[in-house]
Design a protein with these regions (language model features):
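Fungal secretory targeting signals
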Residues: 1-25, 249
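Second-shell loop/turn segments in exported
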Residues: 46-51, 80-89, 110, 219-222
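Short coil/turn segments at beta-strand junctions that form active-site/ligand-binding loops
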Residues: 37-38, 107-111
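Gly/Ala-rich beta-loop-alpha elbow adjacent to hydrolase catalytic centers
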Residues: 113-123
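Surface cap/lid and interfacial helix-loop subdomains adjacent to catalytic sites
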Residues: 43, 57-65, 75, 97-101, ...
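Alpha/beta-hydrolase active-site loop
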Residues: 85-103
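Extracytoplasmic/secreted cell-surface and envelope-processing proteins
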Residues: 50-53, 83-85, 121-125, 152-156, ...
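Short, surface-exposed "cap/lid" segments of acyl-processing enzymes
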Residues: 23-71, 75-77
């Protein structure tokens, strides 16, 4: 009886994953069809957050949209479940399709990618096959990550939640896990000055060690930190604030 129940659960989960993957193109088409803007901020939420804006990045995105006219935001459509690799893969496919359709429809439109927790992994996975010669590399002006499980040590853009360097040498828990895109996929974006990677001191998601406790309190500080929200908004505004034209022109 237990075996049959387990088999049924596995089958049900596989159907859910297929359905989520099938919805990627549909949602990307709906969002990219909304018209061209000077820029779009794509927001990928963390594990178990409800579909919609992430609580950790909502403030900085609102500040950016208010300070820099002509933009809009989109929220990545994906499960954000504890099935990390499957869930993040669905999100990455959605983001990549959104970007490809967007640059085809609105070639002058700029992009910023913002990711929190699993949403940061979604972001890196979505960019894994975007080379420096890809038009998307030029179109993507900014990447802001909070509590990144793929955080790499000593890269440009690494700061802590007080804009210091206490976590500059940190490595995320996902770096040695199956599914890590590889440092060679991440480093060029950072060296181009396009990345602000904020890792709070003690956040074991982005500052992992074998002795890490199970206290996830530091992973939750981003949403309530005015300094984090201001730093993110400042970075986004600076990177997106160059001369832009409507994508349809």
């Amino acid at each position: 009886m237990l075996a049959s129940s387990t088999a049924f659960l596995t089958f049900a989960l596989s159907l859910l994953n297929v359905a989520e993957a099938a919805s990627v193109n549909k949602h990307a088409e709906l969002n990219s069809a909304a018209g061209c803007h000077d820029y779009v901020i794509i927001d990928s939420r963390a594990t178990t957050e409800a579909q919609g804006p992430s609580v950790a990045s909502k403030g900085m995105i609102q500040k950016t949209l208010s300070a820099l006219p002509g933009g809009t935001s989109a929220q990545t459509v994906y499960p954000a479940s504890f099935q990390f690799q499957v869930s993040a893969g669905v999100g990455a496919a959605w983001v990549h399709n959104y970007l490809k359709q967007g640059i085809a429809s609105c070639p002058k439109q700029k992009y910023a990618l913002v990711g929190y927790g699993q949403g940061a992994a979604v972001t890196w996975k979505a960019l894994a096959n975007v080379g420096t010669d890809d038009p998307l590399h030029e179109a993507i002006k900014a990447i802001v990550l909070l509590g990144d499980p793929y955080h790499l040590p000593h890269l440009p853009g690494n700061i802590d939640d007080h804009e210091g360097n206490s976590t500059d040498g940190a490595q995320g828990f996902g770096v040695k896990e199956v599914g890590f895109p590889g440092s060679e996929k991440i480093t060029p974006w950072a060296k181009d000055g396009k990345v602000l990677n904020i890792c709070a001191l003690g956040d074991q998601v982005c500052q992992y060690s074998k002795s890490s406790s199970e206290d996830f309190g530091p992973h939750k500080v981003y949403k309530s930190s005015a300094q984090v929200q201001d730093a993110g908004a400042k970075f986004l505004t600076q990177k997106l604030g160059g001369k832009a034209g409507k994508g349809a022109e």
